[in-house]
Amino acid sequence: NQILEVENLKAVDADGTVLFDHVNFNIEKGQKVVFLSRNPKAMTALFEIINGNRKADAGTYNWGITITTAYLPLDNTDFFNTDKNLVDWLSQYGPGNEVAMKGFLGRMLFKQEEVEKKVNVLSGGEKMRCMIARMQLQNANCLILDTPTNHLDLESIQAFNNNLVGFKGNILFSSHDHEFINTVADRIIELTPKGTIDKLMTYDDYIHDEQIKEQKAGMY
């Protein structure tokens, strides 16, 4: 049942700012966890570390042996330096014929005539929808999402939200979208330079809890 175990993790920004320290948590099966911090770089650093793209400044992490991850990074620029169309682009990332690829794109609200578009001319929102389709194609049991609601319009957020609420695996994510966090997350972990605040509650309850506000005041 072990999904991810993190022990004493620390990340320091290039300018010497401590993004987080003394971070310890265990993710349990099925949990959908939102990560918060006053410094948005903290979440990106955590996600990059647990994906093996960045070295932690201290501490360790261990994934469970049956876990497969799909990562939606904050910066997706490098994925789109090509003149492939949407269907050909998506086909690189998993098995399936053209009809299947169009199905994945359709679920992220791409119309029939849009799938012939070249990916290097897409808007920020369209790129994010492509990245979500790519992630769904990977069929992982743990999704790691760094601010996935960036650039998305309301309709796209709603479509994505509905997919995630029904998702049976684990989700580790960050977001600026209040409603999105509230409907997806069942656990909240706030990353600070002095450790974590870790609660099994809704986002609304978390931000209105007076004890948590007091605790938070001493941690930054």
Q: What residue spans do the PLM features occupy?
A:
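ABC ATP-binding cassette signature C-motif
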Residues: N1-Y220
